[in-house]
Amino acid sequence: MIINETKGRVWHGHVELADTFIKRFRGLMLVSNVNHALIFVLPIENRLNASIHMFFMLSDIDVIWLDSMRRVVDFKTARRWRIYTPKESARYVIEGPVGLIRTLDVEEGDLISWDVTEKKEKSVPVKVSFPGKISFENERNTVVFSKDIIELP
């Protein structure tokens, strides 16, 4: 969810952080249906680092540039195969579906905040060693460990 704190407007959508070099490099390139927002956390606040390119993008997107205080310094709908640089230095760049700017009613100087959607971690199988010996007795639905007995329902 992304919130325009100044106007009390909310965009209810999936939000992810691009806070590593690889995530920022990948961005939304080659995403066919941009239906979520990506917030780029830049290492330093300046205009050059906040520049974006739209090469290899499959659709147009809305882009909002924020300073380190999360105030809007620039915003626009970015078209494919172009380069964009914000008017002022920026520390955060929000890329999202076209309509994001309109939904939030964004203007320069607005204070923007967000709530990142939690990603569920993938489960990874691991080997676990049990002390002692395990045997199964099917007739009584019992698992027998060498040290104790556990009755299963």
Swiss-Prot record:
- For this protein, the parts annotated as crossing the membrane are none
Cite the InterPro entries for this sequence: DUF192, Saro_0823-like_sf, UPF0127
Q: Which domain of life is it from?
A: Archaea
Coiled-coil segments:
none
Database matches in Gene3D superfamilies: Protein of unknown function DUF192
Q: Which NCBIfam families match?
A: PRK03760.1
What family does this belong to? Belongs to the UPF0127 family.
Q: Which HAMAP family does this entry report, sorted A to Z?
A: UPF0127
What is the name of this protein? Answer: UPF0127 protein TGAM_1372
Which organism does this sequence originate in? Thermococcus gammatolerans (strain DSM 15229 / JCM 11827 / EJ3)
Q: What is the lineage of its organism?
A: Archaea, Methanobacteriati, Methanobacteriota, Thermococci, Thermococcales
